[in-house]
């Protein structure tokens, strides 16, 4: 369980409900609340909140006004979970999760709890159900590769070959965004971002494409390889909520779980087998090994 948990960084990188990074969103909500995104508030009965969160409960500002993929992929404190025996859109029929210590989805006595305060929804079938009588599971084929991944790879490759993004770059990114219920890249950045010109440059689109890959392919095992080919994986702090906390005041404290300090440049390429190197002395070993 603990090796497959979303961390706080992933929760932050999903877009706002306007389809841009929450740090860039110039709308009223995120302009006001981004600096205090780790604080908690009472969930208001407005917009689509009733489908995503438990109205009247307390959760972090970070969990409000986010894009549909945030709610589809992540389970979090006071968030709803469609399925698991609940197949109605009515708020009264939706399951919602309590992650604080001594609560049903939090740490009680065993080690079966989330260290970060988040769980994956994507890898769980909505037909799986948990009742007082036991657990009923539904298996399904895990996606090895899917059309959205192909669109994103094509857009990325095309962007890297051009001085400025072409219409095709936007077209294939927008196909993925449309399925997620978001406006196109140029429209979203023009209307909602503090940096409306970002999609117009190669560097800006590179950043956007990489964010789209994270948001669309979250929990599918792609990030491991993406970070390595982009040379973006370096030692960093892994953070989550303070899951030992029993109250909202205690729980919503950003906590460093551990520091990944052993990763170095040589880890971008794994070592070749000795037998492979011995077959051809001119081949040599990968750097650092």
Label the model's feature ranges:
Residues 1-289:
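Acidic/polar-rich alpha-helix caps and helix-coil junctions
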């Amino acid at each position: 369980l603990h090796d497959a948990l979303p961390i706080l960084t992933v929760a932050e990188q999903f877009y706002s409900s306007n389809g841009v990074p929450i740090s860039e969103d110039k709308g009223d909500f995120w302009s006001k609340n981004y600096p205090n995104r780790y604080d908690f508030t009472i969930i208001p009965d407005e917009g689509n909140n009733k489908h995503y969160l438990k109205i009247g409960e307390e959760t972090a500002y970070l969990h409000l006004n986010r894009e549909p993929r945030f709610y589809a992929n992540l389970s979090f404190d006071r968030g709803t979970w469609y399925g698991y025996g609940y197949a109605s859109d009515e708020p009264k029929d939706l399951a919602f999760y309590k992650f604080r210590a001594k609560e049903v989805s939090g740490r009680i006595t065993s080690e079966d709890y989330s260290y970060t305060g988040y769980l994956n929804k994507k890898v769980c079938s909505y037909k799986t159900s948990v009742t007082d009588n036991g657990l009923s599971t539904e298996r399904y084929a895990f996606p090895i590769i899917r059309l959205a991944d192909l669109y994103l790879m094509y857009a990325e490759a095309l962007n890297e070959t051009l001085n400025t993004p072409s219409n095709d770059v936007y077209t294939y990114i927008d196909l993925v965004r449309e399925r997620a219920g978001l406006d196109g890249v140029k429209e979203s950045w023009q209307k909602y971002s503090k940096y409306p010109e970002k999609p117009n440059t190669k560097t800006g689109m590179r950043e956007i494409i990489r964010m789209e890959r994270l948001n669309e392919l979250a929990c599918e095992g792609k990030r491991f390889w993406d970070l390595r080919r982009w040379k973006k994986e370096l030692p960093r702090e892994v953070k989550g909520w303070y899951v030992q906390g029993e109250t909202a005041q205690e729980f919503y404290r950003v906590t460093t779980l551990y520091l990944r300090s052993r990763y170095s440049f040589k880890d971008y390429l794994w070592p070749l087998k000795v037998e492979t190197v011995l077959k051809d002395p001119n081949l040599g070993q990968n750097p650092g090994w």
